[in-house]
Amino acid sequence: MWGGRFSAKPAELMQAINVSIGFDKRLWAQDLAGSRAHARMLISQGVIARDDGEEILKGLDAIEGEIVAGAFPFRDEYEDIHMNIEARLRELIGPTAGRLHTARSRNDQVAVDFRLWVREACDRSAAQLEALQKALVAQAEQYADALMPGFTHLQPAQPVTFGHHLMAYVEMFGRDASRFRDARVRMNECPLGAAALAGSPFPIDRHATAASLGFDRPTANSLDSVSARDFALEALSAASICATHLSRLAEEIVLWTTPMFGFVKLTDAFTTGSSIMPQKKNPDAAELVRAKVGRILGSLTTLTVVMKGLPLAYSKDMQEDKVPTFEAFDALELSLLAMAGMVSDLTPNTEKMAAAAGAGFSTATDLADWLVRELNMPFRDAHHVTGSAVKAAETLGVDLAELSLADLRAIEPRITSDIYTVLTPAASAASRISYGGTAPAQVRAQIARWKELLG
């Protein structure tokens, strides 16, 4: 490959630190796709003879067959996937194999391979997110009216519905999917043909190879073409944000399945037991999804630090771009699939959620709103009056709705018995009719919108 310049073999330690076939063999399909596109372009442009090009293409087909069949001899001595394929091609068709590397460097070769892989990973993630959204929408539709407490600071705040709560995650995951689609648009430029860094003196057609590989256009600067890894950083950023959202939902599932909450149940399919405590049914799938954000965010940090301070153009440091990216998307894909399964699997305890919906004086804001609406009281004054009512209820050990009219009038004489119509969790939730609110009609509107968007 590059032995003409050297008079001695590299040290074993050099070979050990340099070899990457153990992980970059995952790029075999992308490497073959790039090589086919390059070979066809070389034929079309008359850079290599058609007979030679056809022989190369047949050899690449044979290599694909070997890899698919598990018969391809991946070898450490050839360092990486590119040279493993080229060496095998030479074994199959002879010296003609060497013509494939005309007007190409491993620098632009790995750049196109990696872009293709990351592009496919973004497409898979967006599709898996849509599957998760559909699972959430299905549950939300079934429980659009089911009351539960809404929380701030993990303290009861205001009544909401279970459907409304789930639809919040549909929105988050919708933004995640759009981030992957947006990243795909920016990365969809083809670096093939940039060669080592300065471009090629051969009459190549970079637009043709870009089109044949599904790119929108070739990259516009050869130095940037082989230097850039921001497409992977952007994809990892999207993955990290998505994993954060998954972690939040996973945490809630963990909480909801505890006896203290008891809001939902998971079947045996997504839980495990204990080696010593026979009664245990642990939400391990949710806990593992919650933890995966560490691996995924760590991958973003790893690649950011690798790229920080690198001069143009290619440096071997960039070999370290693949493992964190592969690991991050492996973890994300498994997390998305597991979460979709859990969401479909869970069964809410609507009675327990409804009973908890009124806990912690969760209708206090409704009392304040009634004072504003019916007595024309400034909200800050209404807030103070309501706080006094909460204090009185707390002292008596009752809920707001259980305070007598006399108790309430002792705080604000103008209060009438009509106040009791707003102090139930159901009335509270039903009153939130603003766009995007928790009123069941609004929740159903959100569901209808997403069902149309998701198809």
Swiss-Prot record:
Known catalytic reactions: 2-(N(omega)-L-arginino)succinate = fumarate + L-arginine
Protein location: Cytoplasm
Keywords assigned by UniProt, alphabetized: Amino-acid biosynthesis, Arginine biosynthesis, Cytoplasm, Lyase
One Pfam family recorded for the sequence: Lyase_1
Keyword Amino-acid biosynthesis: yes
GO molecular function terms listed in the Swiss-Prot or TrEMBL record: argininosuccinate lyase activity
Enzyme class per UniProt: lyase
GO CC entries: cytosol
GO BP annotation list: arginine biosynthetic process via ornithine; L-arginine biosynthetic process
Gene3D superfamilies reported for this sequence: Fumarase/aspartase (C-terminal domain) (1.10.40.30), Fumarase/aspartase (Central domain) (1.20.200.10), Fumarase/aspartase (N-terminal domain) (1.10.275.10)
InterPro entries, alphabetized: Arg_succ_lyase_C, Argininosuccinate_lyase, Fumarase/histidase_N, Fumarate_lyase_CS, Fumarate_lyase_fam, Fumarate_lyase_N, L-Aspartase-like
Pathway: Amino-acid biosynthesis; L-arginine biosynthesis; L-arginine from L-ornithine and carbamoyl phosphate: step 3/3
Keyword Secreted annotated: no
EC number(s) per entry: 4.3.2.1
PROSITE patterns assigned to the protein according to its UniProt record, in alphabetical order: FUMARATE_LYASES (PS00163)
The family this protein is said to belong to: Belongs to the lyase 1 family. Argininosuccinate lyase subfamily.
PANTHER family: ARGININOSUCCINATE LYASE
HAMAP family the UniProt entry points to: Arg_succ_lyase
Protein name per its UniProtKB record: Argininosuccinate lyase
Record gene name: argH
